[in-house]
Regions:
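Conserved pre-ATP/AMP-binding loop-to-beta segment of ANL
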Residues: 33, 146, 161, 168-191, ...
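Gly/Ser/Thr-rich phosphate-binding loop
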Residues: 164, 275-280, 289-352, 359, ...
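Conserved AMP-binding/adenylation subdomain of ANL enzymes
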Residues: 210-227, 235-277, 290-292
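Conserved AMP-binding/adenylate-forming core of the ANL superfamily
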Residues: 33-80, 84-88, 105-110, 164-165
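AMP-binding/adenylate-forming catalytic core of the ANL superfamily
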Residues: 104, 111, 121-123, 278, ...
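Structural core segment of the AMP-binding/adenylate-forming
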Residues: 64-65, 92-168, 488-491
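Conserved AMP-binding A3 loop
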Residues: 45-49, 187-211
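Conserved ATP/PPi-binding loop(s) of AMP-dependent carboxylate-activating enzymes
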Residues: 372-412, 450
Length: 541
């Protein structure tokens, strides 16, 4: 059919104007005097107008030093005002915002610097030692190195400029970008959590950021009246895009900065700033719940708590609904595709333990596992909540289907727009998915496949268990025996109790029962709160 309008004119306008920055600037115009960002530690509030001016100062200062749309600005920043200034400033320049996981080693950071070759590097003073270590071993040294500190009082080391000095002559006026913006411009480069090897660089373009913001706005839902606080580091996608700077500043809401998480401080901020949405991993929300049970505060402003990073079990879910808010959400996704599966308050607590159902614009399926090739997305496993398959995701609105500078892994993980996640799952007749584990976490014992997450969810049902970690130990007879690390919520818990519990549980087959238990104070998690199924090399059973 012949279009009745000028398609080329529509494309040209849409592709250059439907950008994240234009969304933010609409709020500067409409809500200029409304609060955009609050930093409790410095007792400062930025309105949309003053936040825009601060971002302009950084953008114009970077441009004066030669940063263009061809460049990368990398940063190792805590949740902070400078993080937000950098995020907006890079959109204004048209360059790539590349937030680093500041918990990596100096050697790992050096490799990521050499891969992305940033023109500028911004870091918090807390990371001076690790950044200095990284810079000593890089082949590519950024031309501009900036150190931020919370109170703008510290002096920078040689070869580094303080943030306050770098931006002091920057113009508060909106800078003029030298080239035409496009929704296809890479705007942010995330790095995967690196649970299997060195983090992979994931490019996200402008339209991905806009539609990721829309996804959050639609699913929470989020409005300009909301006040959000993301309890996780903003350097990962769930931090930046789930109730973090990306959607909150796009819709015109207010963000409260939590620089370093403590449960008491988080609850204090909820009460003081009338926060409506919290975002965090189940382990973090569990800490909030325990404090609120013993020392309750007024947290009646909460409209919802969004969990991500690991499965949400039924008993904890019921506690959170009773103690914190009845509106609990749980999201599952990847760095590559943002979140793609969601549990909403009307699903809970009945469907706790599930990852959820697919998000509105996404297609998520469980397909036959084949280690030799990509199976067709149509080769589905039965929807019987028993047959295990691999989760595949089609989310063209939130993905570029690629890794930066890594064609081999791109070919391995993406096929015809589908991401092959490596996550194993079952699903039911309503297409609700339950994550069982990862392909590379699967334990084979006496010829049987055992999925750690499945066993952990059962162990976590014990009233004295706060959290568990299940893995295999090499065994000459069985290949592997099942072992469990337990973080108890009650110090009186014994190995005998756990073995009896496993023996009596109707959903734990004998071959899946842990043979060895050890009790620990902490379990290993990555920066996003996800449980790591890799023990330290010096750990002995």
């Amino acid at each position: 059919m012949q279009p009745s309008y000028n398609v080329e004119r529509f494309k040209e306008t849409f592709e250059s104007e439907y950008t994240y920055l234009n969304g933010f600037m609409r709020n500067v115009f409409r809500r200029g005097n409304e609060p955009a960002l609050i930093c409790p530690l410095t007792n400062r509030t930025w309105t949309y107008r003053t936040l825009n001016e601060e971002a302009n100062r950084l953008a114009s200062s970077l441009m004066a030093r030669g940063v263009t749309s061809d460049d990368v600005v990398m940063h190792a920043l805590l949740n902070s005002a400078e993080f937000v200034f950098t995020y907006i400033a890079t959109h204004k320049i048209g360059c790539v915002n590349a937030p680093l996981n500041y918990r990596l080693s100096g050697g790992e950071i050096a490799l990521l610097i050499d891969q992305s070759k940033p023109k500028a590097l911004i870091y918090d003073a807390e990371f001076e030692k690790i950044i200095s270590e990284a810079l000593r071993s890089v082949h590519h040294r950024p031309e501009i190195i900036i150190m931020a500190d919370l109170n703008n009082e510290m002096d920078a080391p040689e070869g580094v400029v303080t943030y306050r000095d770098f931006v002091k002559d920057g113009s508060p006026e909106n800078p003029v970008r030298k080239d035409k913006p496009s929704i296809y411009d890479e705007t942010t480069r995330f790095f995967t959590s690196g649970t299997t090897n060195l983090p992979k660089a994931v490019p996200v373009n402008d339209i991905n950021e806009v539609l990721s913001a829309h996804d959050v706005i639609m699913h929470f839902p989020l409005s300009p009246k909301d006040v959000t606080m993301n309890l996780t580091p903003w350097f990962h996608r769930g931090g930046l895009h789930s109730g973090g700077p990306c959607p909150t500043l796009y819709i015109g809401g207010t963000m409260v900065i939590l620089r370093d998480f403590t449960p008491r401080l988080a609850l204090q901020y909820v009460s003081l700033y009338h926060i409506t949405f919290l975002i965090g991993a189940p382990t973090v929300i569990d800490m909030l719940c325990r404090i609120q049970e013993t020392n309750p505060r007024d947290i009646s402003s909460l409209h919802g708590i969004v969990l991500m990073g690991s499965p949400l079990d039924k008993e904890p879910c019921k506690r959170y609904m009773k103690v914190l808010t009845p509106n609990i959400f749980n999201g599952y996704g990847t760095t590559e595709t943002f979140w793609n599966v969601f549990l909403r308050p009307y699903d809970l607590p009945d469907k706790a333990g599930y990852a959820g159902g697919a998000c509105t614009d996404d297609d998520v399926r469980v397909v036959r596992v084949d280690t030799t090739k990509h199976v067709s997305p149509d080769e589905l496993v039965p929807m019987d909540k028993e047959t295990v398959g691999e989760v595949v995701i089609f989310a063209p609105n939130k993905s570029t289907f690629a890794y930066y500078d890594n064609p081999k892994t791109t070919e391995e993980k993406f096929h015809n727009g589908w991401l092959y996640t490596g996550d194993l799952a079952t699903w039911d007749e309503h297409a609700y998915i339950t994550i069982i584990g990862r392909k590379d976490d699967m334990i084979v014992s006496a010829g049987e496949n055992i999925y750690p997450v499945q066993v952990e969810s059962i162990l976590n049902e014990h009233p004295k268990v706060a959290e568990s970690l299940v893995f295999g130990i090499p065994d000459p007879k069985r290949g592997s025996v099942i072992a469990a690390l337990i973080r108890p919520s009650d110090p009186s818990l014994t190995e005998k109790e756990m073995k009896q519990f496993c023996m009596n549980h109707p959903m734990l087959a004998p071959y899946k029962r842990p043979r060895i238990f050890r009790f620990v104070k902490e379990l290993p998690h990555n920066a996003t709160g996800k449980l790591l199924h890799k023990l330290p090399p010096d750990f002995k059973f």
